[in-house]
């Protein structure tokens, strides 16, 4: 439910493959999103960026043989966390160091693949060095106090850009947010659950609802390769 008579945000779908072919993609951001971010920040407004994967990269892979690090207990790929250079299972909490070389073929080139909120935050710092950036996910929120501090800073406009996972969708009403970017809609749909499309739509609508909460005119950019 939106505040008063506020209009719903305008939604733009941006093709990541087409943007890359046109040279209109920087890091994990299409030019459309970056242009709208620059405009919003220039007006003194706030931006929220949604990427529903924690860590720096969802997995690491050997560029030679394709080996990936997997949890010995859950058999899921381990997420790479750049801080501490650790591989972490987000299901059971198993942690291990990044191997110096591929355990399978012994080649040293084991590289992070994909991107999570940690990488998004790092890239945003480089693209908008003057902006005040914060991250809201289970790694940055180590306590209720830490959670409250991040929310309070954003609400008081001491933060310009908030990067987060599903935690940023929880019904917050930030008056200063005029733009929401959904960085990778594909990973919401690429789920074996037969209700994946329905749940992806619900989640994207929740995220989109953070834009222009009070005075209308908000915008949402959904990046997808589909």
Residue map of PLM features:
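Inter-lobe coupling/hinge segments of SF2-like helicase ATPases
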Residues: 1-226
């Amino acid at each position: 439910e939106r505040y008063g008579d506020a209009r719903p945000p305008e939604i733009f779908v941006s093709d990541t493959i087409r943007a890359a072919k046109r040279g209109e993609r920087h890091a994990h951001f299409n030019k459309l999103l970056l242009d709208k971010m620059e405009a919003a920040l220039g007006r003194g407004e706030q931006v929220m960026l949604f990427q529903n994967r924690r860590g720096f990269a969802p997995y690491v892979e050997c560029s030679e043989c394709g080996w990936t690090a997997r949890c010995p207990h859950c058999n899921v790929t381990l997420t790479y966390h750049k801080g501490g250079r650790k591989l972490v299972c987000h299901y059971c909490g198993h942690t291990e160091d990044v191997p110096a070389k591929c355990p399978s073929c012994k080649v040293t080139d084991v590289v992070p693949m994909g991107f999570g909120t940690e990488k998004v935050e790092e890239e945003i710092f480089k693209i908008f060095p003057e902006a005040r950036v914060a991250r809201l996910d289970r790694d940055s929120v180590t306590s209720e106090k830490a959670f409250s501090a991040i929310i309070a800073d954003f609400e008081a406009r001491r933060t310009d850009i908030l990067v987060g996972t599903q935690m940023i969708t929880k019904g917050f009403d930030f008056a200063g947010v005029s733009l929401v970017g959904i960085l990778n809609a594909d990973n919401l749909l690429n789920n074996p659950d037969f209700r994946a499309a329905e749940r992806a739509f619900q989640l994207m609508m929740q995220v989109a609802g953070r834009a222009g909460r009070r005075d209308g005119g908000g915008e949402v950019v959904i990046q997808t390769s589909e």
